[in-house]
Amino acid sequence: MLRFYLFISLLCLSRSDAEETCPSFTRLSFHSAVVGTGLNVRLMLYTRKNLTCAQTINSSAFGNLNVTKKTTFIVHGFRPTGSPPVWMDDLVKGLLSVEDMNVVVVDWNRGATTLIYTHASSKTRKVAMVLKEFIDQMLAEGASLDDIYMIGVSLGAHISGFVGEMYDGWLGRITGLDPAGPLFNGKPHQDRLDPSDAQFVDVIHSDTDALGYKEPLGNIDFYPNGGLDQPGCPKTILGGFQYFKCDHQRSVYLYLSSLRESCTITAYPCDSYQDYRNGKCVSCGTSQKESCPLLGYYADNWKDHLRGKDPPMTKAFFDTAEESPFCMYHYFVDIITWNKNVRRGDITIKLRDKAGNTTESKINHEPTTFQKYHQVSLLARFNQDLDKVAAISLMFSTGSLIGPRYKLRILRMKLRSLAHPERPQLCRYDLVLMENVETVFQPILCPELQL
């Protein structure tokens, strides 16, 4: 029995030592959210030397922080349940996997945990002041503002903006992940995240009709799926708590996908989501000279391109799949018809490679009008990227349940990849599509010169 008690004592001591050695993000109970919490900001440092074991740091104790390297601050937002952000560990590890840097998790869970949103939002400037004091000390030790990068989620995006404002916009970069909308919509630039808060500000808007901010806030603002309902998220309250937070959190998971090598999400500068869906805004992907902006960590590769704009701001749109890694692969389908009468309808296109892999895109955001000898360019999105397309199938539908079945006579169809403009363009001539009947054919290389 004595041996058992000694074992339990040693186990408790080892757990206590582990907790002291490796501090973790503050975990609070739902009771804390009910009664509210006072503000306490903790800074936890991760580097490649301590990837899984954080160091608590402050203005007088830097730990492993190397001021000559980039320092990325991760600032979370409102925490109505008191639990740690489920994505935090993945974000820390993802950042350190792509670059040798300092990653500082800004834990203000004591302050953000409350059922009353206004209580949390009222503390954002105080959090920003704590961060400024720490960065001031970093600068005194030889750090450069050029190397300061802040990633702010929801309320954390505005906190990052407040920090940047206190340095007159000389922070290297701020990324806002679905910046909070409530209490910030319509506010003047000094009371929210703004393009002038850093040398480069990129923003992902994923929940503009609820918890997020709709209007542009950065040098480049990304709107996945138009910034509204995200694929794979619950559409009704029957989805439980995910119904409220899934769209809002999607911005974080989209950013995470940019840290992985599985695929790269490309966006298309455009005035509106509808124009993008109609294929009017994909010129950046038609040549290797003018690349499209990339979502997430590598978005700043487009910084020099934006400097040529006045003002240096743009909106970019793209569609995603329902699950990680969320990538969609874009193609232009150019169709010239020779029907005597005008036809209106939808086109469904399938691609198949030599291995038998298939991928499908139904281009049905709005019916397309086909006129004789007029070229129509359709933007098709696929879940898979098939390198060598061996077969293509097309199906035309007017959507009518009654009346005659029409034919769509195609003089020429051309398929070109936007993700890989260097790939050969594929063509087919003299096709007749019977309504609601799938027509399969083998494409040939287009004789035209490549763009």
UniProtKB/Swiss-Prot annotation:
Gene Ontology cellular component terms for the protein in this record: extracellular space; plasma membrane
Function of the molecule: Hydrolyzes specifically phosphatidic acid (PA) to produce 2-acyl lysophosphatidic acid (LPA; a potent bioactive lipid mediator) and fatty acid. Does not hydrolyze other phospholipids, like phosphatidylserine (PS), phosphatidylcholine (PC) and phosphatidylethanolamine (PE) or triacylglycerol (TG).
Gene Ontology BP terms: lipid catabolic process; phosphatidic acid biosynthetic process
Record InterPro entries: AB_hydrolase_fold, Lipase, Lipase_LIPH, Lipase_N, TAG_lipase
Taxonomic lineage from the root: Eukaryota, Metazoa, Chordata, Craniata, Vertebrata
PANTHER family named in the record: LIPASE, LIPASE MEMBER H
EC number: 3.1.1.-
Regulation: Inhibited by sodium vanadate.
SS bond partners: 233-246, 270-281, 284-292, 427-446
Subcellular location: Secreted; Cell membrane
Catalytic residues (positions): 154 (nucleophile), 178 (charge relay system), 248 (charge relay system)
Signal peptide (residue range): 1-18
Associated clinical condition: Hypotrichosis 7: A condition characterized by the presence of less than the normal amount of hair. Affected individuals have sparse or absent scalp, axillary and body hair and sparse eyebrows and eyelashes. HYPT7 inheritance is autosomal recessive.
Enzyme class per UniProt: hydrolase
Glycosylation site residues: 50, 66, 357
Quaternary structure, from the entry: Interacts with TTMP/C3orf52.
Domain of life: Eukaryota
Protein's name in the database: Lipase member H
GO MF terms, alphabetically ordered: carboxylic ester hydrolase activity; heparin binding; phospholipase activity
Keyword annotations of the record: Cell membrane, Disease variant, Disulfide bond, Glycoprotein, Heparin-binding, Hydrolase, Hypotrichosis, Lipid degradation, Lipid metabolism, Membrane, Secreted, Signal
Transmembrane segments: none
Main location: secreted
Reported tissue expression: Present in intestine (at protein level). Expressed in colon, prostate, kidney, pancreas, ovary, testis, intestine, lung and pancreas. Expressed at lower level in brain, spleen and heart. In the skin, it is prominently expressed in hair follicles, including the stem cell-rich bulge region and the inner root sheath.
Catalysed transformations (reactions): 1-hexadecanoyl-2-(9Z-octadecenoyl)-sn-glycero-3-phosphate + H2O = 2-(9Z-octadecenoyl)-sn-glycero-3-phosphate + hexadecanoate + H(+)
Family: Belongs to the AB hydrolase superfamily. Lipase family.
Membrane topology according to the record: Peripheral membrane protein
